[in-house]
C-alpha cells in the first residue's frame, strides 16, 4: 500500500471516530410509558430511532390507567403513548403534560382472536354461539381496549350471557397472553398484537367493525418532566415521520 493511501485511510478512520464521538456526545435518553397494545411496534420504532438519532428510548409497557396513576404519583416518564386520547388530555389539564404537544400517533383496531384456526369466524358469530369456556378481555376500568370489548358485546346483546366466561387481564398484553397460552379459547385483543407486516400471525381472527365501538384514538403527549429533554422532543417528531408510520401501518393501525 502506498504511503498516500495509508495517510488517507488513517484520516478517514480518524474522521469516523470523531464523528462517532460527536454523535455520542449529543445523544440523550428518553423514558417512555407505552400502552401495552403498542408494545411490538414501539420496540421496532425505538430501534430505528436509536439507529437514526443516537438517542436511546427506555420503554415501559402497561395499561394506560395504571400509567395515569403512576404519573400522578411522580413517576419519572418523559412521554406517554396512551391507548386513548382522554388520558393525555386529562394529564394536560392537571398540569402534568404539555397540551400543545398532544397528537394522535395511531388509531387502534379491536380484534377477536383465537390461537385455534377456524374457531373465530370472519363475522364474529362465535360470540352468539358461545361454544367456548373462557373469553379474555382487558380490564375495562384500566384499559381502553377492554372498554371497547364491553361496547362490542353490549352492542351485540351478548354481554350478560358471556360475563360468567370472562377472564380479565390487567392490560391488553396480559389478555393476549391468556389467549396465546390457551387459558382462554379466544379473546378481545388489539389487532396489532396478532398482525405482522399486514398479515395474521397465527390462529383465527375477526377484525371487529369500527362501528361497534368508540374509535380507539391513541394520543402521545410530552409530560412536564420531559420538557427540555432533547431526546424526548426528537422521539415525538420521529413518531410523525415516514419510518415510524410505515411500522405503525404494518401492525394494522391507522394514523
What function would you assign to each model-found segment?
Residues 1-8:
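N-terminal secretory signal peptides that target proteins for export/translocation
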Residues 12-22:
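Bacterial N-terminal signal peptides
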Residues 23-27:
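Sec/Tat signal peptide C-region and signal peptidase I cleavage site
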Amino acid at each position: 500500500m502506498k504511503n498516500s493511501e495509508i495517510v488517507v485511510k488513517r484520516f478517514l478512520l480518524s474522521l469516523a471516530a470523531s464523528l462517532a464521538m460527536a454523535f455520542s456526545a449529543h445523544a440523550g435518553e428518553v423514558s417512555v410509558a407505552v400502552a401495552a397494545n403498542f408494545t411490538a411496534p414501539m420496540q421496532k420504532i425505538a430501534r430505528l430511532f436509536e439507529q437514526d438519532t443516537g438517542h436511546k428510548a427506555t420503554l415501559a409497557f402497561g395499561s394506560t390507567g395504571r400509567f395515569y396513576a403512576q404519573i400522578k404519583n411522580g413517576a419519572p416518564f418523559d412521554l406517554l403513548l396512551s391507548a386513548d386520547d382522554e388520558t393525555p388530555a386529562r394529564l394536560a389539564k392537571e398540569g402534568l403534560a404539555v397540551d400543545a404537544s398532544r397528537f394522535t400517533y395511531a388509531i387502534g383496531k379491536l380484534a377477536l382472536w383465537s390461537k385455534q384456526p377456524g374457531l373465530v369466524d370472519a363475522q364474529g358469530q362465535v360470540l352468539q354461539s358461545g361454544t367456548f369456556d373462557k373469553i379474555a378481555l382487558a380490564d375495562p376500568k384500566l384499559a381502553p381496549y377492554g372498554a371497547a370489548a364491553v361496547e362490542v358485546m353490549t352492542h351485540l346483546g351478548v354481554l350478560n350471557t358471556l360475563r360468567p366466561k370472562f377472564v380479565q387481564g390487567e392490560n391488553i398484553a396480559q389478555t393476549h397472553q391468556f389467549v396465546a397460552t390457551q387459558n382462554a379459547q379466544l379473546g378481545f385483543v388489539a389487532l396489532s398484537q396478532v398482525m405482522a407486516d399486514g398479515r395474521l400471525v397465527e390462529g383465527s381472527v375477526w377484525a371487529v367493525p369500527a362501528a361497534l365501538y368508540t374509535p380507539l384514538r391513541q394520543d402521545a403527549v410530552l409530560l412536564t418532566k420531559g420538557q427540555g429533554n432533547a431526546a424526548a422532543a426528537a422521539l415525538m417528531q420521529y413518531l410523525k415521520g415516514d419510518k415510524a408510520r410505515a411500522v405503525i401501518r404494518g401492525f394494522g393501525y391507522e394514523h
